[in-house]
């Protein structure tokens, strides 16, 4: 039996444009930041906005203030979830513990990697499922960007590998469930999923009425692996669900704080809610209800909504409408998760020489269920798949690895997904950007490097998606900005190369992630499309100028035509009235008028048809 030393992390990546000037302007209105800034700039140079990330500024106090979420926890009444960190500043509640700070590989102070741990209170019921939340931040002043990830570590009990496959199965199932029901990880989307959930007269959310949660429970009852015991089933279909979304709401809040600080967006300050209530520490359902209700209370405390708006809140969906109403321009830049599995075998091996680790069936099961979950119906089609997860163990036992074809197929898949091989580590990645690291010693630095590499690659993709949205808007509304879009995309390619250099220890993994996401091809296609649209816009401008020239020429031509007609008419000043009655003059004027009208109608028809076809092709391209 293989000794189990498995760790599992869910990653949620974000990318934020950094506005240094705006950051300091907002900092002036924050008590926590104004003191730090005044102390730092006391004897600094005149150009205060030229330096943002000087080493003296990147201190624990600044980052704790930057990521402080005690207001959110206290305001929703759930401050007992996390283990507090004792700080020299007692007036600031904090849960962050800095575990790593180092300059990037290029040695410049303007780019630094910061890592913080947020430990879940072991006495709290959430600790039954999750152990800690790690926050990764990379501030890059040169490229005016902030990238990072939230890494959620599962609490996995020490057991044999076969029994732990259920945790991996549940992770795949919740990931698939969220992917099919959440367009993106954000407050708005979570609130929408809890729509139609009733709020009683006491202001409490009745989660029993939640169709979204009921959908999860129905899936779990059909798919939950290994156990039909009612107690175990309740833990997964209710307690786990509530705990998972409590953490997601917290992650969304932290991301909102960073967005508010770093971007020119309409964000409000998260102030402490005066309505603090205490409740039992073993009720995840109440945690989730409190956090959802805190959104409504927070808007009321900050006077962002009227009393009339509050009185109309009868369902969670109504809270979502308020959020959309007052945060309509809020960008959402939190990606769906990747999962990192880290496994330490019971015996140290030299992976350069052989693959003895995969001689056991347990090791093969570990590889298949993490890297090829589709074999067990755990991929994106898991919900519609007829395979019941209780049959995983039996299904796996039926696989005959003594069959040369089966074994060769397994070896081929293993080599295809292999990214990195050293004497101490085997690193695999599948097309979902899930990573399996089999390592003799689980050093934290190795885990950090993997997370950073995935973070950098996904941050580039997030930025590319942003540019594609901006391009579509400009293509329709203001094509004159297409050239600036092209410059932004080209800068993104240089930023991608910069991040590859920052991931030098795992550059192969970085390249593999980009390959799976087809990032380079996406950028090339977008550049070609921008060039094509810009060329069309250039030709369109030429046609407009040509049309204006033709119209101008026609106007002058008409004037000259009438001048010419007037000269050939038999009209004199003395006999004007008699001349107008002359039928010859009437015929000449009539013929001239018909010719002019025909010319004008022809020109207008041609121009209108060309404009119509241009707009039609643009809309249906």
UniProtKB/Swiss-Prot annotation:
It is a multi-pass membrane protein. The keyword Transmembrane helix applies. It comes from the Bacteria. It is found in: Cell membrane. The chain crosses the membrane at residues 240-260, 548-568, 587-607. Keywords: Cell membrane, Membrane, Transmembrane, Transmembrane helix. Its main location: membrane. One of its GO terms (cellular component) is plasma membrane. InterPro entries: MPN337. This is Uncharacterized protein MG241 homolog.
